[in-house]
From Swiss-Prot:
Biological process according to GO: DNA recombination; DNA repair
Gene Ontology MF term list: crossover junction DNA endonuclease activity; DNA binding; magnesium ion binding
Keyword Nuclease: yes
Taxonomic source organism: Albidiferax ferrireducens (strain ATCC BAA-621 / DSM 15236 / T118)
Protein name: Crossover junction endodeoxyribonuclease RuvC
NCBIfam families: ruvC
Family named by the database record: Belongs to the RuvC family.
Record carries keyword DNA repair: yes
Main location: cytoplasm
Length: 182
């Protein structure tokens, strides 16, 4: 399975692509989409750069699914709103290509990648480097995006195991039925 991770940002959005085969995680690509060349007042143009950039990444690497970081509420409400718009442009680009999108908080990603939800950026970078056997540290935005892809790989495996357990338990005496509990 090929997974695209997205760390949305209005100035710099990170992306990371990994392949997952069983327990093996393989690095495919990572990078950033930058709007730093545009003035702050050009919000629609910046959102279009993000939308087009994500569409280009999807077309080039053909992921089967994507994971995006959930926006946290910042002290500055204006910053939170702007980040939400950047995130919306990224998600719209993904779903316009019919990609399923999973969402994870930064805390969930850090917990999955480092084992500690309050890890700092350098710890995330180092663990991503180790997990993907990279020769050097990825940049912070690309590392977060790769971390989101790794998080989704772990979550997808756990969900598959749960579904398999549901099927096994549901095939027994007929007393257990998968689905809603009553």
């Amino acid at each position: 399975m090929r997974i695209l991770g997205i760390d949305p940002g209005l100035r710099t959005t990170g992306f990371g692509v990994i392949d997952v085969a069983g327990a093996d995680l393989t690095y495919v690509a990572s990078g950033t989409i930058s709007t730093l060349h545009l003035d702050k007042g050009q919000l629609p143009a910046r959102l279009k750069v993000l939308f087009d950039g994500i569409r280009e990444v999807v077309a080039r690497y053909q992921p089967e699914c994507a994971s995006v970081e959930i926006v946290f509420v910042n002290v500055n409400p204006q910053s939170t709103l702007l980040l939400g718009q950047a995130r919306g442009a990224c998600i719209t680009a993904l779903v316009s290509g019919d990609l399923p999108v999973a969402e994870y908080t930064a805390l969930q990603m850090k917990q999955a990648v480092v084992g500690y939800g309050r890890a700092d950026k350098s710890q995330v970078q180092e663990m991503v480097r180790r997990l993907l056997a990279l020769p050097g540290l990825p940049g912070p935005d690309a590392a977060d995006a790769l971390g989101l892809a790794i998080t989704h790989a772990h979550a997808a495996k756990a969900l598959a195991r749960l579904a398999q357990a549901d099927g096994v338990m549901g095939a027994g005496s007929g007393k257990y039925k998968a689905g809603r509990s009553r």
